[in-house]
Design a protein with these regions (language model features):
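N-terminal leader/targeting and accessory segments in enzymes
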Residues: 1-96
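Phosphate-binding loop of NTP-binding sites
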Residues: 92-162
């Protein structure tokens, strides 16, 4: 499922800087994981150890044109054809986008909690259910404040259970 950049801007409550048309199919928080730059929306997350804004120039050179930022980079003239979606909190914007995406699907979602064994149980359920239905599951151990929204983004029109 793809969203227009206009729709994403509305869904996350951003102020858009840039006017390029774009359809977003992929979300990115780690510049090392780029696969489809023309359809990617990069969230410049900030943490104690890192600032996603420092990867914008590199990602732009690699073909990404759509960015969610809390701080617009200097020298916008160096980014022709780019869209910057300005928000107060990029993590909150990522979570909000995933929440709105989830609202598009009236399917059952299985949540697994506990201290140990969540990934193993998730994989067992996938093996049990996937022969008879289309299952979308989180890749790896995506169970953090960043991983859950990225997992929810994988839901699509064919998904019967997540």
């Amino acid at each position: 499922m793809r969203y227009s950049i206009e729709k994403v801007t509305t869904l996350i409550g951003a102020r858009r800087i840039g006017e390029a048309d774009a359809n977003i199919g992929w979300l990115l928080t780690d510049s090392r994981s780029l696969c489809f730059p023309e359809e990617t929306l990069f969230f410049a997350l900030r943490s104690e150890r890192n600032d996603g804004n420092k990867y914008i120039c590199e990602l732009y050179r690699r073909g990404v044109r759509n960015f969610v930022v809390s701080r617009v980079p200097d020298g916008l003239e160096n980014y022709p054809g780019a869209n910057f979606l300005k928000v107060v909190d990029t993590l909150e914007a990522l979570q909000r986008l995933a929440e709105r995406h989830r609202d598009e699907f009236g399917i059952p979602v299985v949540g697994i909690t506990g201290s140990n064994g969540k990934t193993m149980v998730k994989e067992w359920l996938y093996q049990l259910l996937s022969p008879s239905m289309v299952v979308t599951r989180s890749p790896k151990s995506y169970n953090s404040q960043i991983g859950v929204p990225l997992s929810v983004w994988l839901l699509n029109e064919q998904t019967q259970v997540a």
